[in-house]
Amino acid sequence: MKLSDRRLAQRFSLAIPLYIRAWKSPAPEQKVESVNVSECGAYFETDTPPSEGTMMQIRLDMPREVTGDPTVEWRCTGKVMRVQPARFPGTLLGVSVRFDYYEVSRTADSLLALASSGRI
């Protein structure tokens, strides 16, 4: 079975900022860029990958192209499922995170846009 056949949700090829850190870590967030995102997880590249099995906190702003609404912030908790080696020497490592939990919150600007359109 192909990996794409096992996926539970549509993946969007989006290069958006992700703010990540190990669950309950006092360390500051690390900013990385997504390669793709779905409602079930995210894939990103980094030069300092977490270990497989690490629980992560991830924060991102999901764009209108995905949600159909003004930008909303997602706060996610997930588990690192896979760390892939760099494709070429000197490039970044790939990290796959499965979301176990997420909250979606609208920003004040997005709430105003929804209210002015009569959608809330």
Predicted regions and their residues:
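Structured alpha-helical
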Residues: 1-120
